[in-house]
Amino acid sequence: MKTEKKVLDELSLHASAKMGARDVESSMNADSTPVLASVAVSMELLPTASVLYSDVAGCFKYSAKHHC
C-alpha cells in the first residue's frame, strides 16, 4: 500500500502542475485510483507514471480503459 500511495502522490503532483490543486483535490475526494489513472492518461503525462502504476495495480495497461 505504501508503494501505491507513493505513486498516487506522484500522479497528484503531475496532475496538480497541469490542472491546479483544486481539481486534484476534487479527484481525490472521488474514487481516487481510477480518477488519477484517467487523469494521467488524458493529460498525457510521462509514460513512466503509467509504467509505475502498472507495477502497483497489476492491471493498468497504459490506458485507463483497461480495468481488472
Curated annotation (Swiss-Prot):
The answer on whether this UniProt entry bears the keyword Disulfide bond reads no
Could you describe the post-translational modifications of this protein? It is not established whether the 2,3-didehydrobutyrine is the E- or Z-isomer.
Give the propeptide positions. Answer: 1-31
One of this protein's GO BP terms?
killing of cells of another organism
- Which GO MF terms does the UniProt record name? signaling receptor binding
Keyword list (alphabetical) reads: Antibiotic, Antimicrobial, Bacteriocin, D-amino acid, Lantibiotic, Plasmid, Pyruvate, Thioether bond
Q: Which residues carry this modification: Pyruvic acid (Ser)?
A: S32
Residues modified as 2,3-didehydrobutyrine are: T33
Q: Which residues form a coiled coil?
A: none
From the record heading this protein, give the residue positions of the covalent cross-link Lanthionine (Ser-Cys).
S54-C59, S63-C68
Residues found modified as D-alanine (Ser) = S38, S42, S50
The function of this protein is: Inhibits the growth of selected species of the genera Lactobacillus, Pedicoccus, and Leuconostoc.
Query: What's this protein's name?
Result: Bacteriocin lactocin-S
The root-end lineage is: Bacteria, Bacillati, Bacillota, Bacilli, Lactobacillales
